[in-house]
Regions:
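Bacterial N-terminal signal peptides that target proteins for export
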Residues: 1-9
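Short, low-complexity disordered leader/linker segments with a strong preference
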Residues: 2, 16, 26-27
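Bacterial N-terminal signal peptides
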Residues: 8-19
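Sec/Tat signal peptide C-region and signal peptidase I cleavage site
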Residues: 20-24
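Beta-strand-enriched cores of mature, soluble protein domains
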Residues: 25-189
Length: 189
């Protein structure tokens, strides 16, 4: 019986080792049904309105308007090789900056191209400032974790996260913008 168990285990291992890479060449699915993941870049743009339709923070003192772009990565190491492949929409955001490192933040992503064209995702949460002196003093690095509260028909909920650079003094060498990952769950594909 032990010999049969070992033979069966070896057969399963062989199928996994040899069929796994072959099956992966077609690529794994992009997610479960009803799951939509977007990865894109935002860059502050004075030509885009910085006033979201709704801002839930009385006394908000941060307003940002940005263009949204798809990105291209190197498949071998996932390094970003093009931060602005195609314009995919715009964003308007507001926040409430105080002396605390946690900034309440609200954003409306208006997508106008691709599968999600004509759809606006709305997200709210907070951004955590982690540095205000890299790559130089006056530039803030932050990460945002936001709950996506509005989306397309059949929208159930989601999350939007960012790696963000804020350059309020408009210092040379860094623009205000973010790399975003947005995951939305819907009742439909």
């Amino acid at each position: 019986m032990t010999t049969r168990l070992h033979a069966a285990a070896l057969a399963v291992l062989a199928v996994f080792l040899f069929a796994g890479p072959a099956a992966a060449q077609g690529g794994p699915p992009a997610g479960e049904p009803g799951q939509h993941t977007l990865v894109f870049r935002s860059l502050e743009d004075p030509n885009v309105s910085s006033q979201p339709k709704e801002c839930p923070f009385p006394g908000a003192n941060l307003f940002l308007g940005a263009t949204l772009s798809s990105i291209e990565t190197d498949a071998g190491d996932s390094r970003v090789v093009n931060e602005a492949v195609h314009h995919i929409g715009t964003a308007a955001a507001c926040g409430l900056i105080t002396t605390a490192p946690l900034v309440p933040f609200y954003i409306e992503f208006a997508l106008d191209h691709g599968h999600h064209g004509g759809i606006t995702f709305v997200a709210v949460g907070a951004c955590q400032v982690v540095s205000n002196n890299v790559p130089r003093a006056g530039i803030a690095l932050a990460g945002c974790a936001l709950r996506v509260t509005q989306g397309p028909e059949g929208f159930l909920g989601g999350i939007a996260t960012s790696m963000s650079i804020f350059n309020p003094l408009r210092l040379q060498g860094a623009g205000t913008g973010s790399f975003w990952t947005l995951r939305a769950y819907t009742t439909e594909n």
